Design a protein with these regions (language model features):
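Rossmann-like dinucleotide-binding domain for NAD(H)/NADP(H)
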Residues: 161, 219-311, 338, 355-362, ...
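A conserved regulatory-domain signal marking ACT and ACT-like small-molecule sensing domains
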Residues: 299, 303-395
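Glycine-rich Rossmann-fold phosphate-binding loop(s) that bind the pyrophosphate
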Residues: 142-143
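Rossmann-like adenosine-cofactor binding region
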Residues: 42-44, 165-258, 273
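Oxidoreductase and adenylate-handling cofactor-binding alpha/beta cores
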Residues: 87-106, 151-158, 284-297, 332-336, ...
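An N-terminal-biased, well-structured beta-alpha scaffold segment characteristic
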Residues: 1-78, 210-212, 233, 345, ...
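N-terminal Rossmann-fold NAD(P) dinucleotide-binding loop
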Residues: 146-147
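Phosphate-binding beta-alpha-beta segment of Rossmann-like dinucleotide-binding domains, i.e.
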Residues: 79-136, 300-302
Length: 395
């Protein structure tokens, strides 16, 4: 039985994925898994029981990923589950950036008298805008969201250029061939009328858009940030707007320094705030966490490699270890020395860590436990789990 601890309100349809036969929700102080949205876990004391954390959303900067990795805790996210919601908001804000819709609507609310229609017609010219068709959009980051923004902007008649040196094969196939691929971020900054940023936050992308990058942009360019606030250097943007280096800034991340500036549109982090996105993220997070706890298979992890193998044997070892030479030999020898036969084995690595799954043709739990203890005691081993396949075990 696995207990799942929740932070924030998780959509019930997602939690329903955890069947009552194998899972409980918030019943103990020693959960096997954690599922959350925006709760910050950097000061959270993780119980030793925690095997995995599933973030119902794309970003994981609210989770101490490095600490989790060192402790053998797998961290999952839900890439693409909220992509459509964010994409729609980006498209809406592209339109808002060229058409003063909000100003016009607010102005109409101030009209008095019985001739409001005549007043509106007489003054509407002050709210004239421009069109997106034919304008150039630069998309920095072509993940699930960036790819969708690029495709839909092209359908609106924009000339779209994308830049992402690490675009995945799957995403690359989904991007319209009409979207031009830039060879550098500088190319995007210098040539586009609108720049929208869609990259994850990391040490390498912190202040990805700063003073130097803003100086490269057109002086009538509009910058949009719906990824993470820290990707854009706030003070540099304010200065660039004041000096006329760029035209406008649209962001989904509130900062008191950005308020009360007519050149800046600030939203209260609405990107994924749709009913559909909340449900999609909860379902994906629950599904991924459930599969990992029941089988040890890893998919959509931000700190460990994708490792999946059909579970047909009576028992399975999953082993988190350092990515150093001779680990597989050490593991397999330790198992074989106890007269346990290995059915199948798979190993994948990611940076300094690796993950190994070993399926064994053994049902003697005393021998299995002894093997697990022996593996755990070996050098460079971080965590060992033993998973019983109820459907395969027959006594």
């Amino acid at each position: 039985m696995y207990d799942i601890k929740t932070f924030n309100a998780i959509a019930p349809v997602g939690l329903a994925r955890f069947n009552e036969e194998n899972f409980t929700i918030n019943k103990t102080e020693t959960p096997a898994g954690i599922i959350l949205r925006s709760e910050k876990l950097h000061d959270y004391a993780f119980p030793a029981s925690v095997l995995a954390v599933a973030r119902a959303g794309a970003g994981t900067n609210n989770v101490p990923v490095k600490q989790c990795t060192e402790d053998g805790i797998v961290v999952f996210n839900t890439p693409g589950a909220n992509a459509n919601a964010v994409k729609e908001l980006v498209i809406a804000c592209l339109l808002l950036s060229v058409r003063p819709i909000l100003k016009g609507s607010n102005w109409v609310q101030t009209l008095t008298g019985t001739d409001t229609e005549e007043q509106a017609e007489a003054q509407k010219k002050q709210f004239a805008g421009t069109e997106l068709e034919g304008k150039k959009l630069g998309v920095i980051g072509l993940g699930a969201i960036g790819a969708m923004v690029a495709n839909d902007a092209y359908r609106l008649g924009m000339e779209v250029t994308g830049f992402d040196p690490f675009v995945s094969v799957d995403t690359a196939w989904s991007i319209s061939r009409r979207v031009k691929r830039a060879q550098s971020m500088e190319e995007v900054l210098k040539t586009c009328d609108f720049i929208t940023v869609h990259v994850p936050l990391s040490e390498n992308t912190h202040h990805l858009i700063g003073k130097e990058q803003l100086a490269q942009m057109k002086n009538n360019a509009v910058l949009l940030n719906f990824a993470r606030g820290e990707l854009v250097e706030t003070e540099a943007v304010i200065e660039a707007l004041a000096q006329g280096e760029i035209s406008n800034f649209v962001t989904d991340f509130a900062d008191e320094r950005l308020l009360h500036n007519e050149k800046i549109l600030v939203l209260p982090h609405l990107g994924a705030s749709t009913e559909e996105a909340e449900v999609n993220c909860a379902k994906m997070a629950a599904r991924t966490l459930k599969k990992f706890l029941e089988t040890g298979n890893i998919k959509r992890s931000v700190n460990f490699p994708t490792v999946e193998m059909a579970f047909n044997s009576p028992f399975r070892f999953t082993i988190v270890h350092r990515n150093v030479p001779n680990m597989l030999g050490q593991i397999s020898t330790g198992i074989a020395n106890l007269d346990i036969n290995i059915d199948t084995m798979i190993n994948r690595s990611r940076d300094d860590y690796a993950y190994t799954i070993v399926d064994i043709a053994e049902t003697d739990e005393a021998k299995i436990n002894a093997a697990a203890e022996k593996i755990q005691a070996a050098e460079n081993i971080i965590r060992v789990r033993t998973i019983k396949n109820a459907e395969a075990v027959s006594y």
